[in-house]
């Protein structure tokens, strides 16, 4: 059994280079006044690739060696984000010999670069969408799977392994138009209809008890949702996996998978892993590299998050209860208070990747729009991320293969921190024949998107323009992205 330490949260941050390699168009920016690191350098890192806020607010952690020799096991999990780590953990807990392969570092992609908000639902499918599309029993089962069960599972893992994820409870959806309160009310009613009642609608004045901003017309207070340190969660899942005898290889990119008569052969740069029973593709927007082009159901897009320097005013003067918030704009703002009087703030979704300067200007403008009382605003961290979306808004969950099952999940639309963990457990349970939860997810139909990746830089701006025109014509209609 590999002995590794639990992830440890710091009281604030340590400015340092990232231990993850810079991949593709993703980037991290650090305020230049902090970009003076100790003379002690970390192999494979650079001051041009600083750690983002999440990595900086955790103590240095274990790194795993890359795979150098052929090996075999029962199940290979490809991807060390939340989905892959949860799947691996729950397989190992049930005695399944599992190896996890990560092309970079654990939590280096979307799982360690998101907004850290815990909200119910399956990507852009919320309770009303489920109630409209499915039978009552199926909708109820799916809603609880993606809400109460997903949130409880995170708490159960935290308690079982004695892990601190900086978990906090309560969430707010803030309406930017009075008409959006109708949609929020219908959503809350659908949740009650499906047997879950943790929400209440508030008007403009009561909402100001929670958000000290005149920008909103009301909102939905959700006591089920909340916030978390996503990289601490990701590392905690890996800690549990290793405690149960699991094996992790980092900097081990999978080039191809091939099913043969005696197993599935997973080809990496330096070695082959033979999965005797199953393979799990937990690589989200990169799934296309290992799936056929004919089965492309997602379009990738880029997201952006920043963390301020410690503010001059107390964050409780902005968010008295400390609840995370996202709003009902088409291009949502999302934000929450974090350690040392900082505000973490994210927004936008683009088909081409913005650079640091454009992102910095945009997010500073959005913060001043929502909270004009903030003076002398300064950013310490800004970074980009990559995710993907499906046409119908739900996550694409697949199980295929001939003799040996291959699982794949992608299309998160920028939502789903808690749900990735729950779906990881569903994959493990499906593999051992313990439940049909994954079968429920795989029954959701998805539309193929021909040349989706190639057309993303054109399709996403076009869609945003069309929805923008629609919002001007009918500002009370709520469509968020």
What feature does the model see in each segment?
Residues 93-113:
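Glycine-rich FAD pyrophosphate-binding loop
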Residues 189-190, 215-277:
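Helical element adjacent to the flavin cofactor pocket in flavoenzyme catalytic cores
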Residues 3-10, 16, 132-240:
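Rossmann-like flavin
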Residues 3-6, 354-355, 360-472:
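C-terminal catalytic lobe of FAD-dependent flavoproteins
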Residues 113-145:
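Glycine-rich active-site loop/strand segments that organize a redox cofactor
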Residues 118, 162-166, 254-256, 272-313, ...:
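Active-site substrate-recognition segment that forms the wall
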Residues 73-100:
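N-terminal Rossmann-like FAD-binding beta1-loop-alpha1 element of flavoenzymes
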Residues 1-75:
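Extreme N-terminal leader/targeting segments of oxidoreductases
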């Amino acid at each position: 059994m590999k002995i590794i330490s639990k992830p440890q949260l710091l009281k604030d941050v340590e400015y340092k280079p990232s231990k993850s390699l810079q991949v593709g168009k993703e980037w991290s920016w650090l305020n230049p006044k902090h970009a003076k690191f100790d003379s002690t350098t970390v192999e494979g890192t650079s001051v041009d690739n600083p750690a983002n806020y999440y990595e900086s607010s955790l103590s240095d952690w274990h790194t795993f060696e890359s795979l150098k020799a052929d090996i075999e096991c029962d199940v290979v999990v490809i991807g060390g984000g939340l989905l892959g780590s949860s799947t691996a953990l729950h397989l190992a807990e049930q005695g399944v010999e599992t190896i996890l392969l990560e092309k970079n570092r654990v939590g280096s992609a979307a799982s360690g670069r998101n907004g850290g908000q815990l909200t119910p639902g399956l990507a852009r499918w919320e309770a009303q969408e489920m109630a409209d599309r499915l039978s009552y029993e199926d909708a109820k089962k799916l809603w609880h799977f993606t809400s109460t069960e997903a949130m409880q599972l995170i708490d159960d893992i935290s308690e079982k392994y004695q892990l601190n994820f900086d978990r906090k409870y309560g969430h707010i959806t803030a309406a930017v138009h009075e008409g959006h309160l109708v949609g929020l009310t219908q959503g809350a009613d659908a949740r009650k209809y499906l047997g879950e009642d943790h929400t209440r609608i508030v008007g403009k004045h009561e909402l100001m008890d929670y958000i000290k901003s005149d920008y909103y017309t009301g909102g939905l207070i959700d006591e089920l949702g909340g916030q978390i340190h996503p990289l601490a969660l990701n590392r905690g899942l890996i800690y549990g996996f290793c405690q149960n005898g699991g094996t992790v290889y980092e900097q081990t990119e999978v080039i191809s998978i091939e099913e043969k008569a005696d197993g599935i052969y997973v080809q990496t740069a330096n070695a082959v892993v033979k999965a005797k029973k199953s393979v799990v593709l937990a690589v989200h927007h990169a799934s296309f590299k290992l799936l056929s082009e004919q089965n492309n159901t997602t379009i990738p897009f880029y997201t952006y998050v920043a963390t301020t320097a410690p503010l001059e005013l107390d964050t409780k003067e902005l968010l008295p209860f400390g609840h995370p918030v996202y709003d009902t704009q088409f291009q949502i703002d999302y934000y929450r208070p974090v350690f040392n009087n900082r505000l973490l703030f994210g927004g936008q979704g683009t088909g081409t990747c913005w650079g640091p300067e454009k992102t910095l200007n945009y997010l500073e403008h959005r913060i001043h729009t929502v909270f004009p009382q903030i003076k002398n605003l300064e950013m310490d961290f800004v970074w980009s991320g990559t995710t993907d979306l499906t046409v119908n808004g739900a996550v694409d969950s697949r199980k295929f293969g001939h003799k040996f099952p291959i699982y794949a999940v992608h299309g998160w639309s920028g939502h789903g921190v808690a749900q990735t963990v729950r779906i990881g457990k569903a994959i493990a349970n499906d593999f051992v024949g313990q439940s049909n939860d994954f079968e429920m997810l795989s029954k959701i139909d998805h539309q193929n998107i021909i040349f989706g990746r190639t057309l993303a830089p054109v399709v996403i701006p076009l869609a945003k323009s069309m929805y923008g025109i629609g919002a001007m014509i009918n500002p009370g209609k709520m469509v968020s992205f």
